[in-house]
C-alpha cells in the first residue's frame, strides 16, 4: 500500500474536529475547522458537506455551494471532488433542508467556472452523484 504523505480533515463543526483530534492518531493526519483547506493540497474531497442547506431558498443555497467550491478550488492543485444529492429535473431543498441538485446543470456550472468536470452516478445510490473537477484540461 502506498504511503500517505499527509491528510487534513476540515469541517465547520468544532465537535467533529475535536472528536477527530482526540480519536484519530495518525502522524500524517491533521484536522482544522473551516470552509476549505488552510493551505494548498493536491486533492480536495467534500463528502456530504454541501447537502445540508441552511435555507429553503435554492438560489441562495446554490450561491453558498458555489462560493465554497470556489474557495476549495483555489486550494486544490490537482482535483476537486464533491458529492451531492441529485434529482432529475429542477434543483430543490427538502423540508428537512437537504439540497438536491440537478446534475447536468451542476456539471455545466462547474465546467464553466473550473474546467473539465466528470459526473459519476451509480444505480445503487440513485439520489447521490459525485462530481470530479480536474485542473489543466
Regions found by a protein language model. Name each.
Residues 59-68, 99-102:
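Charged helix-capping and loop-helix junction motifs
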Residues 1-37:
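Class I SAM-dependent methyltransferase SAM/SAH-binding core
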Residues 42-62:
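A short SAM/SAH-binding and catalytic strip from SAM-dependent methyltransferases
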Residues 91-137:
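Class I S-adenosyl-L-methionine
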Residues 51, 84-90:
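Short "lid" loop at the C-terminus of a central beta-strand within the Rossmann-like core
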Residues 41-42, 78:
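Conserved acidic residues
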Residues 69, 73-86:
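Conserved beta-strand signature within the Rossmann-like core of class I S-adenosyl-L-methionine
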Amino acid at each position: 500500500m502506498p504511503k500517505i504523505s499527509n491528510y487534513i480533515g476540515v469541517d465547520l463543526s468544532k465537535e467533529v474536529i475535536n472528536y477527530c483530534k482526540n480519536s484519530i492518531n495518525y502522524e500524517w493526519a491533521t484536522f482544522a475547522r473551516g470552509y476549505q483547506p488552510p493551505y494548498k493540497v493536491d486533492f480536495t474531497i467534500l463528502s456530504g458537506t454541501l447537502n445540508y442547506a441552511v435555507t429553503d431558498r435554492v438560489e441562495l443555497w446554490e450561491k453558498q455551494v458555489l462560493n465554497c467550491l470556489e474557495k476549495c478550488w483555489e486550494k486544490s492543485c490537482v482535483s476537486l471532488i464533491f458529492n451531492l444529492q441529485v434529482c432529475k429535473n429542477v434543483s430543490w431543498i427538502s423540508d428537512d433542508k437537504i439540497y438536491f441538485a440537478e446534475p447536468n446543470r451542476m456539471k455545466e456550472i462547474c465546467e464553466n467556472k473550473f474546467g473539465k468536470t466528470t459526473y459519476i452516478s451509480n444505480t445503487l445510490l440513485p439520489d447521490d452523484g459525485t462530481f470530479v473537477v480536474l485542473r489543466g484540461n
